[in-house]
Amino acid sequence: MRKPAVLALVLTTILLGSALAAGQGQPESPLLKSWERYVQLKESSEFRLEWVSIGPVLNSARAACVQGDPSRPGTLYAAFGPGNLWKTTDNGLTWKPIFENQSSLGIGDVALAPSRPETIWLGTGVDLKKPRNFTMTGTGVFRSDDGGTTWRNLGLHDSYHIGKIEVHPTNPDIAFVAVHGHYWTTNPNRGLYRTLDGGLTWEHVLYVDERTGANDVVIAPANPSVVYATTWENYPGVSGPSSGVWKSEDGGTTWHRLGGGLPDGPKTGRIGVAVSASDPEKCYVLVDNLNRDETRAAEVYRTTNGGTTWTRTHTADLFIFPRIGWYFADIYLNPRDDEEVYALGVRIAHSRDGGRTFGLLGGDVFHLFPNPAETLHLDHCELWIDPGNPDHLAVGNDGGVYTTFNRGKTWLHHNNIPVGEFYDISVDNQDPYMIYGGTQDDASVFGPAREWNPRYADAWRYVWIDAWSGGDGCYTFADPEDPNTVYFSSQNGAARRKDLRAGRSVSIMPRLPKGFKGRAEYNFVTPYFISPHNHLTLYHAGNFVFKSPDRGDSWKLISPDLARSSDPDR
């Protein structure tokens, strides 16, 4: 008869210990200590170099977050994955960086307090797990109470990657933070955190395991006691059985996992969630359901009874993120009409009938500064819907910030923000020299080392741009003896040589010899360069290394398969 009492005592002790530990937040990150050391060294150095922006602005970079201030028309915030939070107060004609000199440049999410929009919550650390390349980590949560003029770090330093911040609709000091955690290791600090005192203390209110982070969280505006959240098993891969949808009915203190028709297989991926502004029982999720054909993984489900049962809203497949749902899975509802749904992926899927049918947003695109792109850029990261005017949208994607005042019939591209995520840069031998670089999904560009004047377009130009207004530029460099000959590459080993005078390029990607047994494999960003000893000689490498003596017109295989062990028994 004493065993149940003993068991209850043990469980109570475990739970109490967890609550105490959660209240203490997280341990300090070594990244923050490194930043503090850097600040000390910089302040004591006699060589404090001042940096100036030289561009480019014609292409922009991946805008991870966009948020508007409904109380101040014309005020918009845009956060970029590779760096900084920018603010405009004139509908995007001019922008100012407002997150300078902080311990992290990479940003995962930004949220304005609905009841006090000058209070801004910011989560650092890029919120997407790129299996193929570097992802910038963060140093916790920051808060500003003056519209971004000053900032305080509020802890959660060991989060590394923050997926979402949600602020209470009437209390700016209550917020939830969805923490992805460390992408490349197990980590006990994954999960959902809550603060009730403006970030002074934190509670770890939803935790699954050290492989599963929290991805998204929404508070029902009509009843803030109702909170929905999603978890994402993001280590070691990008899917798992612990990915799911959760609900709290007491403001986030206790949680239960929802089922009733939702995908729950071993390959459930990233999940986004949106709740009706008027009905806390009506909720939508966008699921990267890798349990089915990966090209058809994007699925929208809806509940009208608070999560007891769910139904897939559409019969036709969406095809908005084939095989790369780890990049997307964000879903939004019109605050005035919960039958109007936006699902983000490579394209924006739009429904006005509760998700039963979807079309793709496109429309004509105009640029603030000259740009040859004619279409809306791909790969959409966040959408803001003006609650006072649902025709007014702002979207952040791999091409930057776009706004529309007619629900996507026409778009304005705000390519007047000097940001870019460069894989690599190089310079030629001219005097003055030109700079070349390949960017993350914003093509290959070149331009002068000249300080940019925000009132004017810069002098940068494209070496190459794909048909969808972007493309990963990777390595870009000029022939050291002929600056009119430029070499550039794009994802997965593609390589080209361009004659700038003629404006023409040719593919020079190497191929394995005919009849050769084996298969060439390439990293997303493939090593590719000119020999420092002979400007005609090129090298290109994947699991095989190739050498060209004639600018890429021909190639010779100079290595075995480097992905295979030289020991036949291994």
Q: Where do the protein language model's features map onto the residues?
A:
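Bacterial N-terminal signal peptides that target proteins for export
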Residues: 1-9
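Beta-propeller blade termini and top-face loops
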Residues: 24-570
